[in-house]
């Protein structure tokens, strides 16, 4: 089986073409391949499939390092777009893909960045999903003997966003896993720790569901900006600095799609005999 290793700001992926190859990945196999000592090593496995819908170019599947399948990965979407162009699976600059949670358009820019239409952020609790009687801009959660104020949103996957004074000293190792599996998130959640520098610039660390803290999380960056705009703390165009680098997020508010722009890097190609 042939594959490529790619990354978006250090958030790394094994990308597999299932259009021209017959592949099957059990959760156990994914865990073995994800191991950084004895396998390929990656945060997520991305699979390129033939479209289920004739209006789409491809179907996009994402698996975490623990073998669980998820509906969205923003950094992965940018790598997906670069991969299908690099491998000659498509020549268009605007690539339409379906996912578990809907549809996306991935656009290659003139400077080889990738702009992803991430769709409209979803704040209704039952769509996140998040257990709450009604939608609020801020929720109070009790976790790890602490009281936490957070925003909750779905970007195709569930996110919880906490504002912190300094990401360097944020209790990511304690609050990340505790909030990820909090009882009010029935499908677990990705946890973002956001430091606001000014209305157009934030710093962010993300503890990803099923993975742990990563160098970057595209959907997490989108979620943080969406929550910041909803809470009237941020403007519509925001630079997000993550440990692995920067992303640029644009959202014009309710009823409009959110756009994420950033890099996608090809590292190497490989072959595995399974």
From Swiss-Prot:
Protein's GO biological process: lysine biosynthetic process via diaminopimelate
Similarity field: Belongs to the diaminopimelate epimerase family.
Site (Could be important to modulate the pK values of the two catalytic cysteine residues): 159, 208
Amino acids binding substrate: 11, 44, 64, 74-75, 157, 190, 208-209, 218-219
InterPro entries listed in its UniProt record: DAP_epimerase_AS, DAP_epimerase_DapF
GO cellular component: cytosol
Cell compartments where the protein resides: Cytoplasm
Name of a matching Pfam family: DAP_epimerase
Gene3D superfamilies: Diaminopimelate Epimerase, Chain A, domain 1
Organism: Photorhabdus laumondii subsp. laumondii (strain DSM 15139 / CIP 105565 / TT01) (Photorhabdus luminescens subsp. laumondii)
Name assigned to this protein: Diaminopimelate epimerase
Gene from which the chain derives: dapF
Site (Important for dimerization): 268
Any coiled-coil regions, as ranges: none
Catalytic residues as annotated in Swiss-Prot or TrEMBL: 73 (proton donor), 217 (proton acceptor)
Top-level EC class as recorded in UniProt: isomerase
PANTHER family: DIAMINOPIMELATE EPIMERASE, DIAMINOPIMELATE EPIMERASE, CHLOROPLASTIC
Keywords linked to the UniProt accession: Amino-acid biosynthesis, Cytoplasm, Isomerase, Lysine biosynthesis
A GO term for molecular function: diaminopimelate epimerase activity
Pathway recorded for this protein: Amino-acid biosynthesis; L-lysine biosynthesis via DAP pathway; DL-2,6-diaminopimelate from LL-2,6-diaminopimelate: step 1/1
Signal sequence annotation: none
Assembly information from the UniProt record: Homodimer.
Record field: catalytic activity: (2S,6S)-2,6-diaminopimelate = meso-2,6-diaminopimelate
Enzyme Commission designation: 5.1.1.7
Function (record text): Catalyzes the stereoinversion of LL-2,6-diaminopimelate (L,L-DAP) to meso-diaminopimelate (meso-DAP), a precursor of L-lysine and an essential component of the bacterial peptidoglycan.
